[in-house]
Amino acid sequence: MIFRAATADPADVDRALAYPADGPVAALTAEKVREELAGNRLRPEWTWFAEDADGEVLARALWWGRADSERPIALDCLQVRASVADPAAVAAGLLAAGHAAFGNLPDYNVSLPRGWRDEPELAAAVAWRQEAAYKAGLTREIERLRYEWTPAAGTTGPTGRLVFRDGTDEEFLDAFVRLSAGSLDLHTQTELRSMDAEQLAREDVAFYLDCPGERSWWRLAHLPDGTLAGMAIPSATPYHRNVGYLGVVPEQRGQGLIDEILGEITRFHASQGAERITATTDSVNAPMAAAFDRAGYQVTEIRLVLEAPSTR
């Protein structure tokens, strides 16, 4: 078996486009691959094949990044021909080859419909992908709900329970530190096992500054008496406006203030003409999921995230 990037021959990109987007797990179509290549979010060096001795392509892996990314951020598409007897082994070898070339282990995002475990063919296709990812070092698994808001859902007006204002970098850093305490977010919980809250806060600030959204959108949320209640960080992806980050400080939780903060983010994006606002939360984060439901956001897919454990 030969594992290689689509860089050896000008025809390699055409081969990537020609690979059928079939199978029970959703795959990128030729049109979508072409669009992402044009936007520099997919690249030949991030597109990998597994070939047999005769040069037949048996598997395809497409890693994705932002247009200015130096290395890929996530694996978006992994396919193995139905004729392959052990798809997990071939896929694991393909992922390992890509990881070695990139010098890192990007997450693998698998987009799935709700109730996917109840569909035997789909569940089996997910299972070999999980096995391959695990063998390639992506041993941590998180299931997330992907939400979407459209103008048909409408917005709610401010109630006056919170006052939103801009803040300094240090104020936002402090808010990130405070919000991490008792967080139900699995990523936050995991990272806090290997670093302190301030280090994680600095990484979170850097992450959102690097997103396509604007720093000027960020808001601190205060009670009318000036007490910090939480934070709203509207953001964006290369495709749509995004909820970004929001939260309530521990001492103010349980009073419905998350609805006020989510409402502020939604109103902001809607006022800018957003036709779609996306968001994700862990499936086990019931309070956040309930807030999205109350705000009219709809679950559009389940996102199974397979990632490498923290090495710190």
Predicted segments with their positions:
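Conserved hydrophobic beta-strand within the GNAT/NAT acetyltransferase core sheet
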Residues: Y108-S111, V243, I277-T281
